[in-house]
From Swiss-Prot:
Keywords from the named record: Hydrogen ion transport, Ion transport, Transport
Organism in which the protein naturally occurs: Xenopus laevis
Function: Subunit of the V1 complex of vacuolar(H+)-ATPase (V-ATPase), a multisubunit enzyme composed of a peripheral complex (V1) that hydrolyzes ATP and a membrane integral complex (V0) that translocates protons. V-ATPase is responsible for acidifying and maintaining the pH of intracellular compartments and in some cell types, is targeted to the plasma membrane, where it is responsible for acidifying the extracellular environment.
Gene Ontology MF: a single term: proton-transporting ATPase activity, rotational mechanism
UniProt subunit comment: V-ATPase is a heteromultimeric enzyme made up of two complexes: the ATP-hydrolytic V1 complex and the proton translocation V0 complex. The V1 complex consists of three catalytic AB heterodimers that form a heterohexamer, three peripheral stalks each consisting of EG heterodimers, one central rotor including subunits D and F, and the regulatory subunits C and H. The proton translocation complex V0 consists of the proton transport subunit a, a ring of proteolipid subunits c9c'', rotary subunit d, subunits e and f, and two accessory subunits.
Name recorded for this polypeptide: V-type proton ATPase subunit F
Entry similarity comment: Belongs to the V-ATPase F subunit family.
Superkingdom of origin organism: Eukaryota
InterPro entries: ATPase_V1-cplx_f_g_su, ATPase_V1-cplx_fsu_euk, ATPase_V1_fsu_sf
PANTHER family, alphabetized: V-TYPE PROTON ATPASE SUBUNIT F (PTHR13861:SF2), VACUOLAR ATP SYNTHASE SUBUNIT F (PTHR13861)
GO cellular component entries: membrane; proton-transporting V-type ATPase, V1 domain
A Pfam family reported for this protein in Swiss-Prot or TrEMBL: ATP-synt_F
């Protein structure tokens, strides 16, 4: 999970937070002072971890590193953009969703 404090705390309370064998957490709380570089590095490190199958990221944070997210083309780990308390979800900004929609025709969805 990469998100604001409320989002990450909610998922941690739900039991998804853990440390891997190298004592690295599977979450990042993004605060005002968190640099874009740190977010990018964390996202890239999550992509390379074999213990992570899904990366949940607040959409407003995904917008900060959109250029990195758009380069991710493999299905695992899946990247899901989620809303935060302060920022509602906007499907038009979700590049992963746009790519997925392009894979199917209307007949496939019937």
């Amino acid at each position: 999970v990469i998100g604001d404090e409320d989002t990450v705390t909610g998922f941690l309370l739900g039991g998804i937070g853990e440390l891997n064998k190298n004592r690295k957490p599977n979450f990042l709380v993004v605060e005002k002072e968190t640099s874009v570089t740190e977010i990018e590095e964390t996202f890239r490190s999550f992509l390379n971890r074999d213990d992570i199958g899904i990366i949940l990221i607040n959409q407003f944070i995904a917008e900060m590193i959109r250029h990195v997210i758009d380069t991710h083309t493999i299905s695992i780990p899946a990247v899901l953009e989620i809303p935060s308390k302060e920022h509602p979800y906007d499907a038009t900004k979700d590049s992963i969703l746009r790519r997925a929609k392009g894979m199917f025709t209307m007949e496939d969805l019937r």
